[in-house]
A protein has these predicted regions:
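Sequence/structural signature of beta-propeller domains
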Residues: 38-344
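N-terminal low-complexity, Pro/Thr-rich disordered segments
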Residues: 20-46
Length: 344
């Protein structure tokens, strides 16, 4: 069965050429919220970037990495593949097959006890939780999650603020539970009262102002961006300024890494019947285009699900600044994280 699915993914792969602020608003009452001011960066001859086709692929859902060999892990059509910087793909972990669920997002472990390059994926069917997919393709359950609601976000803490654990969000109506999981599968609840969030979570680097080390999470319904602290407080960073609403609002997040050779990648999944039906491609923005748009290392990129309009958030001692930096195809349907590959 995997062979047929892998062949479908690889046959669908074809190389393609690569190319609001709010002030002092407070988050909904959770008993754990504060406020943060934002401002808008003045445009200084900056050129907005554009998401273009990096590679065609069947049913892409999420991208994560890079791994130590420079490849990006792609979740597509219920399986995993590895994307090389030139856009070529090869199957990975034939034993892994998503048991179902609309959005079983993934992340790749940094060096440490989780195992460098090991993939962790949300499992949305019983037993619900997180599965571990080793670098040699073996699959086992890491943790079973019992909090009520939809498991809808996953991100590694690479800063140490959360003890270098894996963070998972579970949404139940207007409230979100955040669980921290260690490499042995032990679970600690960070909060059960965070605001509603969903999608491509990211933990902020230390350079991200007062929010360094916090879990950054968007809410596609309202369009706002929250920071969730290791102590469980939810702080409003600001409004993204992107269109918001179900299947429209800000969905994907990723921090631009140091090094200056980053190419941003984002899954654009075909979703028939949606206002943004998608393209079944992985979209990309090259490093030169990011630089021309004023994006630099340490910035947070946030892309909307409908049309992949993209903001950059930059936080420092003086506060946070939010600015539109990229546009995408109007029909695009962004999903999962924004990952960064070695630029072509």
């Amino acid at each position: 069965m995997w062979a047929k699915a892998a062949l479908a993914i690889l046959l669908a792969v074809a190389l393609a050429a690569c190319g609001g602020s709010s002030g002092g608003r407070t988050s909904p009452s959770t008993g754990e919220a504060a406020s943060a001011s934002t401002s808008t960066l003045a445009a200084k001859r900056l050129q907005p970037a554009r998401w273009t086709t990096f590679v065609h692929v069947s049913r892409p859902l999420d991208v994560a990495g890079p791994r130590r060999d420079g490849s990006i892990v792609l979740a597509a059509a219920g399986h995993l593949a590895l994307l090389a910087p030139n856009g070529s793909a090869r199957p990975f972990a034939s034993a892994y097959r998503s048991p179902g669920g609309e959005e079983p997002y993934i992340d790749v472990a940094p060096p440490g006890c989780f195992g460098a390059d090991v993939v962790y994926a949300l499992r949305l069917r019983p037993p619900q939780g997180v599965v571990r997919v080793s670098a040699d393709g073996r699959v086992r359950q890491l943790a079973i999650l019992s909090a009520p609601g939809l498991i809808d976000g996953i991100a590694f803490d690479r800063t140490g603020a959360f003890g270098r654990r894996l963070l998972v969000t579970i949404n139940a109506g207007r409230r979100t539970t955040v669980e921290a999981i260690d490499c042995r599968g032990h679970i600690q609840t960070i909060t059960q009262h965070a605001p509603r969030v969903e999608g491509g979570l990211a933990v902020a680097p230390a350079s991200f102002g007062r929010f360094g080390g916090d879990l950054i999470a968007p809410d596609e319904i309202s369009g706002v961006i929250y920071a969730i602290t290791p102590g469980g407080k939810s702080i409003l960073i600001g409004a993204s300024g992107l269109p918001h609403g179900q299947d429209i609002g800000v969905e994907s997040a990723g921090f631009v890494p140091a090094g200056g050779r980053a190419e941003a990648l984002l899954a654009d999944r075909r979703t028939p019947g949606n206002r943004h039906p998608g393209d079944d491609v992985v979209l990309g923005i090259g490093r030169a285009a990011l630089a021309a748009a004023g994006v630099r290392a340490g910035d947070l990129l946030l892309a909307g699900e409908g049309g992949t309009l993209t903001d950059a958030v930059r936080c420092g001692r003086a506060g946070c600044q939010i600015r539109r930096v990229a546009v995408g195809p109007r029909i695009a349907h962004g999903e999962g994280h924004i990952a960064f590959s070695v630029g072509r």
